[in-house]
């Protein structure tokens, strides 16, 4: 099971209803943060997410609404006597900005902070990978892909029966080693399992104009969290952001399962934005959501379920 928790769903500045961008991805007990806008630690407290479970932070770019919560988050970790290292990833200048935080005031963390400046790369971890790709925002900026590793196919009862295998330690050994000797023959894992199952894929663009790289990296994503700051091109002006229509078109072309319209400009109320976005997305046939603060998208058995932590009283 994987969960995407929207700690801050607004853009540019906080409002009474929405905080600035911060997204937590919860997977197998780990919390991965994508952007840490001002007040992220408070949002985590409200969502009952422990900062001590955060091992990796991925920052898309260094406009204040996407990273100013980093200092408070690190200091809170220190107050809680954190010992394990923290890894911070981001575009060019990440090292400089993080060092500025660490050198400000009378504060030194009691744990290691490792900074990684990225271009376009693929980071491999135990059960998943993180891919970074360049987006168009007028400054060094990255989008990110979380890609769970593909899983083995399910054991096929008829194949197990064919080889005289039953559930138990022997199947555990087969899964671990990839093959076993049984009744005088070698049985491989693929002999008794179905097709490999594709791991879940989540893409976050950060702030960006429409660009072909997003479509390429979002191909067949289960969830695309796309900058959709404005309802219309006329509202955009000279900013390096996307409209709802542009986000929908990217999702349609990339054959995305679910589109999350993110970074809504503070000029729009939720109802106003929902009304306008619904018309646009329905015309393109895109399945979409407009996240609010503390919305949770849970991916299980190939489907997304949406709930809100505060409304559910969790």
UniProtKB/Swiss-Prot annotation:
Cited Pfam families: Lactamase_B, Lactamase_B_2
Taxonomic superkingdom: Archaea
Transmembrane stretches, start-end: none
Protein name: Ribonuclease Z
Family, per entry: Belongs to the RNase Z family.
EC number: 3.1.26.11
Cofactor remark: Binds 2 Zn(2+) ions.
Broad enzyme group: hydrolase
SUPFAM superfamilies recorded: Metallo-hydrolase/oxidoreductase (SSF56281)
Binding site for Zn(2+) 1: 61, 63, 137, 207
Organism (species): Thermococcus gammatolerans (strain DSM 15229 / JCM 11827 / EJ3)
Catalytic activity: Endonucleolytic cleavage of RNA, removing extra 3' nucleotides from tRNA precursor, generating 3' termini of tRNAs. A 3'-hydroxy group is left at the tRNA terminus and a 5'-phosphoryl group is left at the trailer molecule
A single MF term (Gene Ontology): 3'-tRNA processing endoribonuclease activity
Cofactor(s) needed: Zn(2+)
Binding residue positions for Zn(2+) 2: 65-66, 207, 263
